[in-house]
UniProtKB/Swiss-Prot annotation:
GO terms for cellular component: cytosol. GO terms for biological process: CMP-keto-3-deoxy-D-manno-octulosonic acid biosynthetic process; lipopolysaccharide biosynthetic process. InterPro entries: Cytidylyl_trans, KdsB, Nucleotide-diphossugar_trans. It comes from the Bacteria. NCBIfam families: kdsB (TIGR00466), PRK05450.1-3 (NF003950), PRK05450.1-5 (NF003952). Activates KDO (a required 8-carbon sugar) for incorporation into bacterial lipopolysaccharide in Gram-negative bacteria. It comes from Vesicomyosocius okutanii subsp. Calyptogena okutanii (strain HA). The gene is kdsB. This is 3-deoxy-manno-octulosonate cytidylyltransferase. Its EC number is 2.7.7.38. Belongs to the KdsB family. HAMAP family: KdsB (MF_00057). It is an enzyme of class 2 (transferase). Keywords: Cytoplasm, Lipopolysaccharide biosynthesis, Nucleotidyltransferase, Transferase. It catalyses: 3-deoxy-alpha-D-manno-oct-2-ulosonate + CTP = CMP-3-deoxy-beta-D-manno-octulosonate + diphosphate.
């Protein structure tokens, strides 16, 4: 199945400045993410960035890059501009892989593409079960709840589902959202005409605007390892430890 991976790569990061260029055993973090994407079934992998420093580093390790404007509030908006610049057909499947997901197994990228192709929902994404109680209470861990057919009901940094009675607490009901999305190019382009929803603004989660606009998002547990996304220094330390 033909599809492209686009990796939105922003230099500025309030919680971990310049994190995509941080060294992980001789390679910048963004290179690890790129190499995993290349090892998927993608026809092409593009790094979309608004910063020359990332462009230079990415070109040095052989990546295709596309410069975008710097004012975008989400990775999807950055990808939408790439699609317009490259005149990509509306029917093409695009996978949005966050630049700070250096341990995402390539098969997971293929999985989310297959999920999009075999479901009627406009967007597909992934999750994994939370097994650590501390992670459930961590606002850096985005939680997702979904119904029996895999349709997302809500994403939040808050503790969802909330257990009113302590005796009912069960991590088997708790899932962490994995920051990889598949959608048709035409769906992504619609983001350019959307206003960020109030929910996105307060939670800082772009997928909440898609839900607010009426898009259906398919969610499924990842079929393979997704490792650590890197949001803070502790995450980066864990990645270095696991890959050391």
């Amino acid at each position: 199945m033909n599809f492209s991976v686009i990796i939105p790569a922003r230099y500025a990061s309030s919680r971990l400045p310049a994190k995509l260029l941080r060294d992980v055993h001789g390679k910048p973090l963004i290179q690890l993410t790129y190499e995993n994407a290349v090892n998927s079934g993608a026809n092409r992998v593009i790094i979309a960035t608004d910063d020359k420093r990332i462009e230079v580093v990415a070109n040095d390790f052989g990546a295709i890059t596309c410069m975008t404007d710097g004012h975008f509030t989400s990775g999807t908006l950055r990808i939408a501009q790439v699609l317009e610049k490259l005149d990509i057909n509306d029917d093409e499947i695009i996978v949005n892989v966050q630049g700070d997901e250096p341990m995402l197994d390539p098969s997971v990228i293929d999985q989310v593409v297959n999920n999009l192709a075999t479901n009627p929902m406009q967007i597909a994404t992934l999750c994994k079960q939370i097994t650590d109680k501390a992670q459930y209470f961590d606002p850096n861990c985005v939680k997702v709840v979904f119904n029996k057919i895999g349709k997302a009901l809500y994403f939040s940094r808050a503790t969802i589902p909330f257990f009113r009675e302590a005796r009912d607490f069960d991590l088997k009901l708790c899932y962490k959202h994995i920051g990889v999305y598949a959608y048709r190019a035409g769906v992504i382009k619609q983001y350019l005409t959307m206003n960020s929803s109030s929910y996105e603004k307060v939670e800082k989660l772009e997928q909440l605007t898609a839900l607010n606009e009426g898009f259906d998002i398919h969610v499924a547990p990842a079929c393979a390892s997704v490792g650590h996304g890197v949001d803070i220094q502790r995450d980066l330390d864990e990645v270095r430890k696991e890959l050391g």
